[in-house]
């Protein structure tokens, strides 16, 4: 009977013998100087980082593609404990920038995670900082990976409430955590070239007054604080929802925003209801772009917008509910690329359900209102002697079905199927791979040579300083065509 089990025992012995040989082969190591590691990158570079603020983590994969295992005697940072970089090798943090005795089996790999916290430099602009991560093999061969990042000093603000007049300067950006509040009775002045970088869930809350005094070539910038990239081709700064936005409360009047760039927020600019006796906001030569909610949300207040671009929002690009507004030479463009269920380019209303809010004035002059789709202008309007509703489109380019109303639609060009160029084809640059846009009219654009000269004379230069009145007939929108 036992003879019947002999083949089984012999097979088991052979298998164990083979396994032992396989394990022995797997655990063979080499000290040949020709056997080296392969790195997933020879350089790891961070974009500009705020000094003293920890970076995001980058991953380096270290491969051994040879037939024998490799032992790493030492892994260390070139500057060791003085390095602003930190490394974790195969789960082990490098103490004082050094670590010993690592192994990479044949046809295997280990992972290195790297971060950095850059010191303050005392300089106004970015300063390059570099180091090396060095691998010393058991053979004595040394391999290295270059590490680099640019340090940018900044004013770091946490939950600040301004209760008196304040001026922000331009020598370095402001990084804001937990929001910045301008209290009632206080004025915040932002000088030309000032940059405000808001952390996630932080925004600008204005109960007092904001004077953002940008200039051509020196805009005041409102943006998120992420300086790294989502993908190699896509900076986080080009994606929406990085910070909250700007909100003017009911107590806030007399605000001015000139040459401002507001982008990549959860909302753009929100104006709460105020008395119409005093202008709440004047915005000129500015951009509100790439927003995860509404671009402009205007509720029962008064505001003037000129030479301004409002574009690419998940919500409504310009939402108006009651109040008094004027838009002159503005480009309102709804080409939000990240979701198909985007809002309208323009929404006008004087009521929400049974709550009425008189629309005393919504005048659009020499402006462009367009986007994807055949109708991007919507509204909910009650008309009659009890409901004020004064809206006007004067020499505008409109992406909506034509309306026969000579009193409210004057000199309008309709974006319809009869036009040779429609929607995004009217503009110079639409790079939807890298999310780069230039809303300057193309040479054959329908937007060209259609604006009212009398209104253009009020703003003789476009948002980029190009002469608008040098043509016999100016272009609509905030940009004037110039040949490249």
Please report, for each region that a protein language model flagged, where it lies by residue.
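C-terminal motif of bacterial Sec signal peptides marking the signal peptidase cleavage site
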Residues: 19-22
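Asparagine-centered strand-capping/turn motif at beta-strand->loop junctions
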Residues: 62-66
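Short, solvent-exposed loop/linker segments at beta-strand-coil boundaries, enriched for Pro/Gly
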Residues: 78-98
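Bacterial N-terminal signal peptides that target proteins for export
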Residues: 1-11
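Short acidic/proline- and small/hydrophobic-mixed sequence motifs that coincide with surface turns
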Residues: 55-56, 67-72
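Beta-strand/loop edge motif enriched in small/polar residues
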Residues: 24-30, 37-48, 53-59, 96-437, ...
